[in-house]
């Protein structure tokens, strides 16, 4: 019974992380840009 009560409260607990979840899909794009900038810095060796 306690586990079901805990699961019911989880969405409320995750509301704090909503902005973080909105940002998460963008992170791979930043890695792609970082790789491009790094290659530009070393002169595309």
Swiss-Prot record:
Membrane topology designation: Single-pass membrane protein
Pfam families the UniProt entry points to: PsbK
GO biological process assignments: photosynthesis
Superkingdom, taxonomy of origin: Bacteria
Annotated S-S bridges: none
Residue ranges of the TM segments: 24-44
Subcellular location: Cellular thylakoid membrane
Main location, first listed in the record: membrane
UniProt entry tagged with the keyword Aminoacyl-tRNA synthetase: no
GO cellular component: photosystem II reaction center; plasma membrane-derived thylakoid membrane
Keyword Membrane assigned: yes
InterPro entries: PSII_PsbK, PSII_PsbK_sf
Keyword annotations: Membrane, Photosynthesis, Photosystem II, Reaction center, Thylakoid, Transmembrane, Transmembrane helix
Propeptide: 1-8
Family designation: Belongs to the PsbK family.
Quaternary structure note: PSII is composed of 1 copy each of membrane proteins PsbA, PsbB, PsbC, PsbD, PsbE, PsbF, PsbH, PsbI, PsbJ, PsbK, PsbL, PsbM, PsbT, PsbX, PsbY, PsbZ, Psb30/Ycf12, peripheral proteins PsbO, CyanoQ (PsbQ), PsbU, PsbV and a large number of cofactors. It forms dimeric complexes.
Function: One of the components of the core complex of photosystem II (PSII). PSII is a light-driven water:plastoquinone oxidoreductase that uses light energy to abstract electrons from H(2)O, generating O(2) and a proton gradient subsequently used for ATP formation. It consists of a core antenna complex that captures photons, and an electron transfer chain that converts photonic excitation into a charge separation.
Protein name listed in UniProt: Photosystem II reaction center protein K
Organism: Synechococcus elongatus (strain ATCC 33912 / PCC 7942 / FACHB-805)
Gene designation per UniProt: psbK
């Amino acid at each position: 019974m306690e586990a079901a009560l805990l699961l019911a409260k989880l969405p409320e607990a995750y509301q704090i992380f909503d902005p973080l979840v909105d940002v998460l899909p963008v992170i791979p794009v930043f890695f792609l840009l970082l790789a491009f900038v790094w290659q530009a810095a070393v002169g595309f060796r």
